[in-house]
Amino acid sequence: MATSNSRPHLLQTHKPFSVVLAISITFFLLLLNKVNSAEILSFSFPKFASNQEDLLLQGDALVSSKGELQLTTVENGVPIWNSTGRALYYAPVHIWDKSTGRVASFATSFSFVVKAPVASKSADGIAFFLAPPNNQIQGPGGGHLGLFHSSGYNSSYQIIAVDFDTHINAWDPNTRHIGIDVNSINSTKTVTWGWQNGEVANVLISYQAATETLTVSLTYPSSQTSYILSAAVDLKSILPEWVRVGFTAATGLTTQYVETHDVLSWSFTSTLETGDCGAKDDNVHLVSYAFI
């Protein structure tokens, strides 16, 4: 949840949206022409159920009585320190194909709330991630978010994550931020994030295989403010062929630095072309996600 000392140029916006009751974020998945077949995985959770059999819950994660995915422990309405939880979709995603060399495009949208009793002592954050199917909670939690053992880069992790970081650790930039993480909690790219305590955040993350571009957008409907971050990421060189996707979150490692981490809804779609193909510019599929 940090960035290197040489910080690259970022695409960043902080602008009002004209839509009051809904946000519709649309993007194009550029698919290959003359496609014979494709592997498509798609699911949607408008809310969550206590007996949600298609989710794998790790650590302190649970589904609350409100139908929300509660990633870290809350007791009597108060978040607890040193809590880590993760939730992953049960079915692995075929993210690239070794026999063809092709890589999947994907998009995921979700809404979440992070609420701290004391805003100045928020910790530590929440992340969406892709990891090997058997990946379990890693490290001490806290600023590593249950993803990594340390802040150093290690290719053996085989993890890509987008973190929403509410606490400034030693490896972080000097601000709350959204970061793109590749095999390290020390993000390859970040954008300053004006976290709004207790407010619903709507997120869209998309990956364009044709351009190897990972794009993140976060919007607060209450203030009509948005944040955008984009980076070049070669999934095939980082991830195994099959991954699981999901969320992870952690509270601080001392008693005062705590917050809640609740996912309200989640949708995901991936498309991996498996048939013969020709040019790249004719077959364009449109996917649109709307938050109401």
Curated annotation (Swiss-Prot):
Mn(2+) binds at residues 163, 165, 172, 177. One of its GO terms (molecular function) is metal ion binding. The keyword Signal applies. The keyword tRNA processing does not apply. Ca(2+) binds at residues 165, 167, 169, 172. Keywords: Calcium, Glycoprotein, Lectin, Manganese, Mannose-binding, Metal-binding, Signal. CDD domains: lectin_legume_LecRK_Arcelin_ConA. It comes from the Eukaryota. Glycans are attached at residues 82, 154, 186. Residues 1-37 form the signal peptide. Belongs to the leguminous lectin family. Mannose/glucose-specific lectin. This is Seed lectin.
